[in-house]
Each structure stands twice: as structure tokens, then as C-alpha cells.
């Protein structure tokens, strides 16, 4: 049995190498991601949104830009397969520090074995309260990602680079 997410991903990838599994995965990916020069494989549907047509058009344009950054026309099959086998996919949203108004300039794929979301609950003892049980109250929750090029090992004392949650896109 797998003890960590990284062990699970490794196991999933091993299973995907078996010819029968590989063929089944290919069938699923081919059904999900179709290649057609005249039509996109995926699109955002805004018909039921309660917004103006201008906002809907902006959403559609931004979605097309994300597909362009992902090179979805050429890499869509591979991206979907990675997500399907690993059960998750991560991208770092890169923004030009000198000109942040330009928005996201690049989406970098991150190996899911090398990144982990951390939810740290910071607790405090209520002021003026003396209790034999030493009750602590959850004061705030801090979320961030930890990235380690060598991979995330175990769950205790995770070492690596802390990354703000708003710079990572994942599912």
C-alpha cells in the first residue's frame, strides 16, 4: 500500500506501463481529446452565465490564451494522459515581475511528485485563560506549496521552496 501521494503516483505510473493498461488509457485519452484541425478539443461554455456578452467574450478569449500557453493543440493528448495517470496535474503561473500588468506569461508543468500543498493551522492559547488541559484555539490557517526538485519524501519536515498558492494552478 502507498503511504504518500508520491508513492501513489509512482505506483500509478508503474501500472500504466503494463501493455493492457496502456492500451486502455490510450483509448480513454483518445476519446477525451480529439484532434481536429477545424475544431478545438475543448472549449469554455458561457451560455448559462448571468453576465454580459462582453464579459463572456473576455472569458472565452482568456481561455483561448490559456490553451495557447499550454500548447494544447499539440500537447493536449500528453497533458490529459499525465493528469489521468497521475490523478493530478500542477502548473506554475509565471508573471513578468517587471510588468505584472501583462498577466500570466507562461505556464510551467511541475511534476506532482515534487510538489505538495501544505495547510498549516496556527494555534494560540486564549489570553487570560488558565486551563489544566492547555486548550489551544485555531487562530489562522496558512496554505502554501512546497517544491523540491529531488521530490517530496514523507510528510514530516518537508523541505523545499515555499510557493504562494496563487502562483500554482492544479487539479
Where do the PLM segments sit?
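Structured, contiguous alpha/beta core segments that scaffold functional sites
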Residues: 1-30, 70-171
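General N-terminal leader/first-domain-start detector
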Residues: 1-65
Amino acid at each position: 500500500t502507498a503511504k504518500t501521494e508520491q508513492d501513489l503516483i509512482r505506483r500509478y505510473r508503474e501500472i500504466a506501463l503494463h501493455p493492457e493498461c496502456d492500451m486502455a488509457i490510450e483509448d480513454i485519452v483518445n476519446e477525451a481529446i480529439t484532434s481536429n484541425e477545424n475544431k478545438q478539443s475543448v472549449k469554455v461554455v458561457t451560455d448559462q452565465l448571468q453576465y454580459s456578452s462582453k464579459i463572456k467574450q473576455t472569458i472565452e478569449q482568456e481561455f483561448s490564451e490559456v490553451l495557447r500557453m499550454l500548447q494544447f493543440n499539440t500537447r493536449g493528448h500528453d497533458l490529459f494522459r499525465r493528469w489521468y495517470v497521475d490523478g493530478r496535474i500542477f502548473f506554475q503561473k509565471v508573471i513578468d515581475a517587471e510588468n505584472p500588468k501583462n498577466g500570466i506569461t507562461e505556464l510551467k508543468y511541475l511534476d506532482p511528485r515534487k510538489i505538495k500543498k501544505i495547510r498549516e493551522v496556527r494555534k494560540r492559547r486564549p489570553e487570560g485563560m488558565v486551563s489544566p488541559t492547555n486548550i489551544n484555539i485555531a487562530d489562522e490557517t496558512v496554505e502554501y506549496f512546497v517544491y523540491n526538485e529531488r521530490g517530496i519524501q514523507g510528510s514530516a519536515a518537508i523541505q523545499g521552496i515555499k510557493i504562494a498558492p496563487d502562483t500554482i494552478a492544479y487539479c
